Amino acid sequence: MAEGLVLRGTMRAHTDVVTAIATPIDNSDMIVTASRDKSIILWHLTKEDKTYGVPRRRLTGHSHFVQDVVLSSDGQFALSGSWDGELRLWDLNAGTSARRFVGHTKDVLSVAFSIDNRQIVSASRDRTIKLWNTLGECKYTIQDGDAHSDWVSCVRFSPSTPQPTIVSASWDRTVKVWNLTNCKLRNTLAGHSGYVNTVAVSPDGSLCASGGKDGVILLWDLAEGKRLYSLDAGSIIHALCFSPNRYWLCAATESSIKIWDLESKSIVEDLKVDLKTEADAAIGGDTTTKKKVIYCTSLNWSADGSTLFSGYTDGVVRVWGIGRY
């Protein structure tokens, strides 16, 4: 019996591109999404046939596209980054913005929480990476010298604690690995022939995957800073994520969502959206009128690896579940 993914349902409330999806580590019935509609939505997962989740709260305050959102490990707070140049920390219970982080001079493209939630890192079009405490104080700015020479599109903490690490991706075509303790550069990973949109670190912190304009995913050994192999996705890559419990890597590309088994390096799933079927299933069936090409821009697994949440350019979150066939 092979394992595959089937469309379980959709979640509709955003009116523009879904830019990021954050899932809780305790697998509770909630997720948080960010969008170009300038809002962040806290969803309650009903897991019903067609409507997989309903919006419980809409968090507003950013004055431009919200580009990224992550959750604190206790699920009480969300952290967002926006094209308005700010980060915001949100109290999800109160539905209010607890803190604003001001310091970047251009759009904030990516944000991340450290494992202990005490440190926050952000990446911006101003070419810098900033390290903050949770009070909103900028503790360090990585700029000039070893820093990226173009927009910093993505930043992630490595989950392995022995050597706390930040990984960043940039439009300068490189991925950089930094020591968190002193913000010093450990490695520059070069190999992409176009801008890099996204970087993901494997659950054990040993691997890093990067992707972007050239449509090729590069896999790197994080400790050694060496390139291991590449996977051809065939079109621009907007998001990457590792499965938490299978040796799988997912890529959101402009043609489909592709999932690789990293052991065999073969594609196990190629998920495409059938708008006609979806419109027939949806109430009103109005999706067929939209002739725009839609594609996935954000991805995240549930903590138990059974559900893949995917956000699209049409503002819809599509939810895929593991099934056997």
UniProtKB/Swiss-Prot annotation:
WD repeats lie at residues 13-44, 61-91, 103-133, 147-179, 191-221, 232-261, 291-321. GO terms for molecular function: ribosome binding; translation regulator activity. CDD domains: WD40 (cd00200). GO terms for cellular component: ribonucleoprotein complex; ribosome. SUPFAM superfamilies: WD40 repeat-like. Keywords: Repeat, Ribonucleoprotein, Ribosomal protein, WD repeat. PROSITE patterns: WD_REPEATS_1 (PS00678), WD_REPEATS_2 (PS50082), WD_REPEATS_REGION (PS50294). Pfam families: WD40. PANTHER family: RECEPTOR FOR ACTIVATED PROTEIN KINASE C RACK1. Plays a role in hormone-mediated cell division. Belongs to the WD repeat G protein beta family. Ribosomal protein RACK1 subfamily. This is Small ribosomal subunit protein RACK1.
